[in-house]
Swiss-Prot record:
Belongs to the UDP-glycosyltransferase family. PROSITE patterns: UDPGT. Coiled coil: none annotated. Keywords: Antibiotic resistance, Glycosyltransferase, Transferase. It comes from Streptomyces antibioticus. SUPFAM superfamilies: UDP-Glycosyltransferase/glycogen phosphorylase. GO terms for biological process: antibiotic biosynthetic process; response to antibiotic. This is Oleandomycin glycosyltransferase. The lineage of its organism: Bacteria, Bacillati, Actinomycetota, Actinomycetes, Kitasatosporales. Gene3D superfamilies: Glycogen Phosphorylase B. The keyword Calcium does not apply. It comes from the Bacteria. The gene is oleD.
Length: 430
């Protein structure tokens, strides 16, 4: 903790999803190490993982699909997905309000998905800082992406009902912002991906968004991994934690790298596929339902990834060439960014045959220009500041340095004056 900052109560809010909890943990660990009292609102399934970094878990019941649920549980359309988040937010808000009724924090820290956190920050009159584990909106995003994406859903009866319910919930809580503005435009946000992964980074509002890059830590609690003796090249294959039901793809990976002279394959298959479904495995192939990904990437020569935000930045941070095989949502955009940076090749799942995987792998690992680009990006990421800079920026928002906001119930038009906005002078000091 810096000498200018008095210890504070910082409350973090997130959902039960690996891709949203994991990116925050090292930031939380750093805030605890600086002497702050940190609480972390989270469903029980992540309580132990959160507690291991130092905060006190504040448990709440969530109606969102769990971390090991099939992707189909989120629905098949954009509107299905957003309704699921809104339903959960509405039922979670009273739980969280009760949990913090006698322990109002000095600052609210929250994942981008935690609508209740932002409502409570307004109610309590405390600053709120969003942690974004993936890309953020740029100037022009609404016209270029959001409007075309939402044009049809808005015209349906279900779409109109969704917006009406969202607006009513916000108004019940004294917030006059449009739901899209409330959900997608926080007053202050720390972006936990490297700027290199952000589309149109030059058009991102730097008065709101600060790229601090990867906040990884050493991940010692995840265990280590030993590169086998004699392995000239190591390839890690992982489709993350959600979209892992791909036995045919895994079999193609075994065919591509199994018995390839000098190569060793580490294959993470998740909990929805069994090793038996992959057939006979050569001696140079190891299969696991989960692996300590960062520990392996620090020793790997190639990463076959779904291009989730976490995996993409870990590949960049370890300067590992990538084959991106996106499965859903933002992964397709991430894959495009990686390919555009010249450090990866993007393949569709259906075209990722053994022959093409092997051909692409050999081209990537033998290309000195790919290695040079990766080293440059790795150096740029190191300059973004990571965990310590994130903690510094959070401390800068604390009431000791920050004008405390009036509670939402005591002032009109709260949506027009979001909590947590600093002056240009305060920002330039950082």
């Amino acid at each position: 903790m810096t000498t200018q900052t008095t210890p504070a109560h910082i409350a973090m809010f997130s959902i039960a999803a690996h891709g949203h909890v994991n990116p925050s943990l090292e930031v939380i660990r750093e805030l605890v190490a600086r002497g702050h009292r940190v609480t972390y609102a989270i469903p029980p399934v992540f309580a132990d993982k959160v507690a291991a970094t130092g905060p006190r878990p504040v448990l709440y019941h969530s109606t969102l699909p769990g971390p090991d649920a099939d992707p189909e549980a989120w629905g098949s359309t954009l509107l299905d997905n957003r309704r699921t988040f809104l339903n959960d937010a509405i039922q979670a808000l009273p739980q969280l309000a009760d949990a913090y009724a006698d322990d109002i924090p000095d600052l609210v820290l929250h994942d981008i998905t935690s609508y209740p956190a932002r409502v409570l920050a307004r109610r309590w009159g405390v600053p709120a800082v969003s942690l974004s584990p993936n890309l953020v909106a740029w100037k022009g995003y609404e016209e270029e992406v959001a409007e075309p994406m939402w044009r049809e859903p808005r015209q349906t009866e279900r779409g109109r009902a969704y917006y009406a319910r969202f607006e009513a919930w916000l108004k019940e809580n004294g917030i006059t912002e449009h739901p899209d503005t409330f959900a997608s435009h926080p007053p202050r946000s720390l972006v936990l991906i490297p700027k290199a992964l952000q589309p149109h980074a030059d058009r991102v509002d730097e008065d709101v968004y600060t790229f601090v890059g990867a906040c990884q830590g050493d991940r010692a609690e995840e265990g280590g991994w030993q590169r086998p003796a004699g392995a000239e090249k190591v390839v890690l294959v992982s489709l993350g934690s959600a979209f892992t039901k791909q036995p045919a793809f895994y079999r193609e990976c075994v065919r591509a790298f199994g018995n390839l002279p000098g190569w060793h394959l580490v294959l993470q298959i998740g909990r929805k596929v069994t090793p038996a479904e992959l057939g006979e495995l050569p001696d140079n192939v190891e299969v696991h339902d989960w692996v300590p990904q960062l520990a392996i990437l620090r020793q790997a020569d190639l990463f076959v990834t779904h291009a989730g935000a976490g995996g993409s930045q870990e590949g960049l941070a370890t300067a590992t060439p990538m084959i991106a095989v996106p499965q859903a949502v933002d992964q397709f955009g991430n894959a495009d960014m990686l390919q555009g940076l010249g450090v990866a090749r993007k393949l569709a799942t259906e075209e990722a045959t053994a022959d093409l995987l092997r051909e692409t792998a050999l081209a990537l690992v033998d290309d000195p220009e790919v290695a040079r680009r990766l080293r440059r990006i790795q150096a740029e990421m190191a300059q973004e500041g990571g965990t310590r800079r994130a903690a510094d920026l959070i401390e800068a928002e604390l009431p000791a340095r920050h004008e405390r906001q009036e509670p939402v119930g005591d002032r009109p038009n709260v949506g027009d004056r979001p909590a947590g906005v600093r002056s240009d002078r305060q920002r330039s000091a950082l």
